[in-house]
Amino acid sequence: MNPNQKIITIGSVSLIIATICFLMQIAILVTTVTLHFKQYECDSPANNQVMPCEPIIIERNITEIVYLTNTTIEKEICPKLVEYRNWSKPQCKITGFAPFSKDNSIRLSAGGDIWVTREPYVSCDPGKCYQFALGQGTTLDNKHSNDTIHDRTPHRTLLMNELGVPFHLGTRQVCIAWSSSSCHDGKAWLHVCVTGYDKNATASFIYDGRLVDSIGSWSQNILRTQESECVCINGTCTVVMTDGSASGRADTKILFIEEGKIVHISPLSGSAQHVEECSCYPRYPGVRCICRDNWKGSNRPVVDINVKDYSIDSSYVCSGLVGDTPRNNDRSSNSYCRNPNNEKGNHGVKGWAFDDGNDVWMGRTISEDSRSGYETFKVIGGWSTPNSKLQINRQVIVDSDNRSGYSGIFSVEGKSCINRCFYVELIRGREQETRVWWTSNSIVVFCGTSGTYGTGSWPDGADINLMPI
């Protein structure tokens, strides 16, 4: 090859290499520009139209780093559209309950600044569970904790923390309330907060951190609500509220709420005679509540709520092993599904149960007369057969030598089914423990399991002699 041919060959190769490099740079530039603009677009699965990310609620902001040769491109992955919860999955099949959480608030109060509370409950958004309680406007090691046995003061507020985090000084005070309920509709939290004078209280409806609606007392006798989670189906949330006598006829209404706005109010109908402090759970396409009859029955009222047409029905749990306290012993207790049993009906305690086909799972104090101990079990035929008493799968949650209190249900949606969980309030202090002047609580939480489980007891555990007076 002569010199001229060498020069031509080298030049041709160089030109080809330069052309390839030029085309690569153009490809990189096009890719960079495309990815840059695509970070502001999302494909809608419904109609394949391009929609801006901006109006979509972002639950988690995920950043993906893409490396192309020496160029770094930062691309935001658009989140999926947040939707209302519909709770349409079936209920999980369980064999019993397994330990889930315990906050040890009273034990921690012996050496730290922990709120004085009562009326706790648990509720979950689609990704995380939270514990709530009504604070008394004071910590335990504080002279303001004296005489906190009283239920209704203007200083009480609804507290909210992640489940398992005790109510420390940094805890968020969601609203002013001496009675409350909370639930998440899939997009935001709804809080129902009752406060004010006994004869003229106000219920505030707070949605997504904003006051949206309110309603005043309709019977001028302690307007009150569930003290556990409400339930939202396809954007409509239901909450049971009562105003009137705690030991006689009262006026119960079921409120239907959409994004904090009251859209309908239905009166209680059916055979339930007295309804308070309902523990509600989704039973698609409706909502079912197990409540407290503080007037006539130690068997628990059932309230069925139709979310679509706002209709209401009520009855009583059929199980002859009844769930309220005080109650008759199991040999002499009765329940025939439709009416209160007129057995030690005056007074009571908040509790829960849920149907499982024809059977019923339930929890109650071990003591028949006081808020001591706690047990759960399943009653065969307890949902459909009057006065059924065949008990299986009994578990002790708190032994009979230790105090319990209110209890309630909450629901957790899994990949294939909806699990039922419950909490137990572990009350300490006055009236029973007179060495101290305060009344407060901790909680223990269990959830349904399809596995095996052992035995134990999970009381509050604080030594009252080590506690601030």
Swiss-Prot record:
Cofactor requirement: Ca(2+)
Membrane topology note: Single-pass type II membrane protein
Intravirion side: 1-9
Keyword Cell wall biogenesis/degradation listed: no
Annotated binding of substrate, by residue: 118, 152, 276-277, 292, 371
A single cellular component GO annotation: virion membrane
Membrane spanning residue stretches: 10-30
The reaction(s) this protein catalyses: Hydrolysis of alpha-(2->3)-, alpha-(2->6)-, alpha-(2->8)- glycosidic linkages of terminal sialic acid residues in oligosaccharides, glycoproteins, glycolipids, colominic acid and synthetic substrates
Active site: 151, 406
Enzyme Commission number(s) of this protein: 3.2.1.18
Class of this enzyme: hydrolase
Location of the region described as Head of neuraminidase in the Swiss-Prot/TrEMBL record: 91-469
Region described as Involved in apical transport and lipid raft association: spans on this chain: 11-33
InterPro entries per record: Glyco_hydro_34 (IPR001860), Sialidase_Influenza_A/B (IPR033654), Sialidase_sf (IPR036278)
Record topology, Virion surface segments: 31-469
Gene Ontology MF, one: metal ion binding
Note: The influenza A genome consist of 8 RNA segments. Genetic variation of hemagglutinin and/or neuraminidase genes results in the emergence of new influenza strains. The mechanism of variation can be the result of point mutations or the result of genetic reassortment between segments of two different strains.
Family (UniProt): Belongs to the glycosyl hydrolase 34 family.
Free-text note on domains in this protein's UniProt record: Intact N-terminus is essential for virion morphogenesis. Possesses two apical sorting signals, one in the ectodomain, which is likely to be a glycan, and the other in the transmembrane domain. The transmembrane domain also plays a role in lipid raft association.
Protein name, entry field: Neuraminidase
Natural source organism: Influenza A virus (strain A/Port Chalmers/1/1973 H3N2)
Taxonomic path: Viruses, Riboviria, Orthornavirae, Negarnaviricota, Polyploviricotina
